[in-house]
Amino acid sequence: MEQDDRLLNAMFEMCNHKNPLNDGQREWHIADIPGLLREERYDELDERYNQALTESFTSREAEKRYFFAWNQMDNPFYDMDTLVEAGPQGLALIKNWQRARPRSTHAWLAEAQYWNHRAWLYRSYGWARETTRAMWICAAACNERMVIAALNAIDCEPRQWMAAALISTNSKVFGQPEWLVEFLVGADV
């Protein structure tokens, strides 16, 4: 047990050195998504995130900024945190954004990240051997919703690499929905 604690502490220390602090020189935060959604400032959200996505193609720092804004794992700079933690109320705000801007890649990416978070909550962030059959079933259902939202995000903006990254990462853990596998192998779906 003591050895496990030392190993975990060493891993946390290593991760902390990889992720620089969010100081004045390095701002990972792009926008207060929940606040702007509550105020229905959809154009501002889309403008900020579209600009960040565009910048991510030409700058490693901008790529990190965009990645950390959307990546929840062990990340204090995650723009979506309070929105996904709000549960159904957070999802309702995202759905309002989608209704107002159905071609917004980031409105769909927000939903993908919402379902991604839910899938991992059901799966549990601990060891997989602690995950019950019921938890796996719920996680798979959330993952399927995540895949659908991520594909919509990519349909709106084919260069939407964060949605592709979510699908790729989760396929290793949850697999892919059967209908997607059939589609990818050329079956009529």
Residue ranges and their predicted role:
Residues H17, G24-E39, D43-R103, Q113-V189:
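Short coil/linker segments at helix-helix boundaries
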Residues L109:
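Membrane-embedded glycan transfer/ligation machinery
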Residues M1-H29:
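Non-catalytic protein-protein interaction scaffold segments in large eukaryotic complex-forming proteins
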